[in-house]
């Protein structure tokens, strides 16, 4: 019997040059500019992957909707989508936009249209002008001959008001005429595809076919974003891999319904993480079901954290904290990690403006001597709190060097001040750069 060191498998592993690498290069796509006033958000091209969100208010309630949009924008949402489903909602859109402008909130608004968008855009020009982008669902824009006419009316409105569109296909509202035709064609094949593959192909054909029709109607390729949303993780990955291969349009990623709590977060992360790692995706929306009474901003934070943990963007300083074990019977490190994370998020609206680059800072809060000092040295700022039976002292590391040891009841306050001082010292104020 060969020893492990002599086995062919072991020899092969040891002699093979390691191949390391991060995410794949971004898929090439048309850049789509979305504007409101002086605010420009570009989707696709070489722009960063964008985070967007959607309100759940009654859009006819202009004040309530504007308040929620402001909350989402303050959390970091770069575009906010609102439902435009009734004449009352369409009539409220200019008032919503006006209130946001008065509050200094310039985030572009996306109108979400289903069934009657062609009528609302025609009858409420103030709505058409106040929105920065239109979402069109080709599966419910109309049936039969009306579908082509009503789709054309929406594209003509987009061209008239110089607005980009997202042609968003959902498997829950897929064009049934297209699906029936494709099922019939599949039945005539010598080797028919399975039903799932036909569904995937129908989603892709609906999206690309509608986009090409929009181009024929005069809308530029740089005014079109596509999406093909489904609820299953593997389904989303399969559809977007093929969609990305077959077109050059900017792509919007997201599950149709991710679900609640940890399940929704895990599903979204699993699906989007794979696609983003492969360079597929230009903007994302995390469709979480919030807990009753919970803030809508959770979906924005999850989207940001997906991009930041993958190294694609930076939004706020990252707090690295150990999970705890039998060595960490004290809850001090957990409490400190939570306090520091909350403190950093609270400071970011000001720090983002005054201290550019601070969003890339890493802070480590560790619970014992095993990994604490080592992990702390790899962060910009780190603290290693004492575990069970350890000396009741907490060494602090800055840029890899031990600079101080904290003791006593005010460790949290003192460490927070160290973080604040580090930010002020290491990240230049914007006025100093101008």
From Swiss-Prot:
Keywords: 4Fe-4S, Iron, Iron-sulfur, Isoprene biosynthesis, Metal-binding, Oxidoreductase. Pathway: Isoprenoid biosynthesis; isopentenyl diphosphate biosynthesis via DXP pathway; isopentenyl diphosphate from 1-deoxy-D-xylulose 5-phosphate: step 5/6. Binds 1 [4Fe-4S] cluster. It catalyses: (2E)-4-hydroxy-3-methylbut-2-enyl diphosphate + oxidized [flavodoxin] + H2O + 2 H(+) = 2-C-methyl-D-erythritol 2,4-cyclic diphosphate + reduced [flavodoxin]. GO terms for biological process: isopentenyl diphosphate biosynthetic process, methylerythritol 4-phosphate pathway; terpenoid biosynthetic process. Gene3D superfamilies: Dihydropteroate synthase-like, Sulfite Reductase Hemoprotein, domain 1. Residues 1-24 are annotated as: Disordered. One of its GO terms (molecular function) is 4 iron, 4 sulfur cluster binding. HAMAP family: IspG. PANTHER family: 4-HYDROXY-3-METHYLBUT-2-EN-1-YL DIPHOSPHATE SYNTHASE, 4-HYDROXY-3-METHYLBUT-2-EN-1-YL DIPHOSPHATE SYNTHASE (FERREDOXIN), CHLOROPLASTIC. NCBIfam families: ispG_gcpE (TIGR00612), PRK00366.1 (NF001540). Belongs to the IspG family. This is 4-hydroxy-3-methylbut-2-en-1-yl diphosphate synthase (flavodoxin). It comes from Burkholderia cenocepacia (strain ATCC BAA-245 / DSM 16553 / LMG 16656 / NCTC 13227 / J2315 / CF5610).
């Amino acid at each position: 019997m060969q020893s492990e060191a002599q086995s062919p498998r072991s020899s092969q592993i040891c002699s093979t040059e390691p191949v390391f690498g991060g995410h794949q290069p971004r898929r090439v796509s048309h850049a789509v500019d979305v504007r409101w006033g002086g605010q420009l958000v570009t989707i696709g091209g070489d722009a960063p992957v964008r985070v967007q969100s959607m309100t759940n208010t009654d859009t006819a309630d202009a004040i309530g909707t504007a308040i929620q949009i402001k909350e989402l924008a303050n959390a970091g949402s770069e575009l906010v989508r609102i439902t435009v489903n009734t004449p009352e909602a369409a009539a409220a859109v200019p008032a919503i936009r006006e209130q946001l402008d008065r509050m200094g909130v310039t985030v572009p608004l996306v109108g979400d249209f289903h069934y009657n968008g062609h009528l609302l855009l025609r009858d409420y020009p103030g709505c058409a002008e106040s929105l920065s982008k239109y979402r069109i669902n080709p599966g419910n824009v109309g049936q039969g001959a009306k579908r082509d006419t009503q789709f054309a009316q929406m594209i003509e409105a987009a061209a008239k008001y110089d607005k980009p569109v997202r042609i968003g296909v959902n498997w829950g509202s897929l064009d049934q005429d297209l699906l029936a035709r494709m099922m019939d064609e599949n039945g005539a094949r010598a080797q028919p595809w399975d039903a799932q593959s036909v569904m995937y192909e129908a989603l892709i054909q609906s999206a690309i076919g509608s986009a090409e029709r929009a181009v024929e109607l005069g809308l530029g390729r740089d005014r079109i974003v596509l999406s093909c949303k489904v609820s299953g993780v593997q389904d989303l990955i399969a559809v977007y891999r093929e969609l990305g291969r077959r077109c050059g349009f900017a792509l919007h990623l997201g599950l149709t319904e991710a679900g609640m709590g940890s399940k929704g977060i895990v599903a979204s992360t699993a699906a989007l993480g794979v696609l983003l790692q492969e360079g597929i995706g230009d903007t994302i929306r995390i469709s979480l079901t919030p807990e009753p009474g919970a803030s809508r901003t959770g979906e924005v934070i999850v989207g940001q954290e997906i991009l930041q943990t993958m190294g694609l963007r930076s939004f706020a300083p990252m707090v690295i904290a150990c999970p705890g074990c039998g060595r960490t019977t004290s809850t001090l490190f957990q409490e400190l990690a939570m306090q520091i994370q909350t403190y950093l998020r609270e400071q970011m609206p000001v720090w983002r403006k005054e201290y550019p680059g601070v969003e890339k800072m890493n802070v480590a809060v560790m619970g014992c001597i095993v990994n604490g000092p080592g992990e702390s040295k790899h962060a910009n700022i780190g603290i290693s709190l004492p575990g069970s039976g350890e000396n009741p002292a907490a060494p602090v590391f800055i840029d890899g060097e031990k600079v101080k040891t904290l003791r006593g009841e005010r460790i949290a306050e003192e460490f927070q001040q160290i973080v604040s001082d580090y930010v002020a010292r290491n990240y230049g104020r914007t006025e100093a750069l101008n």
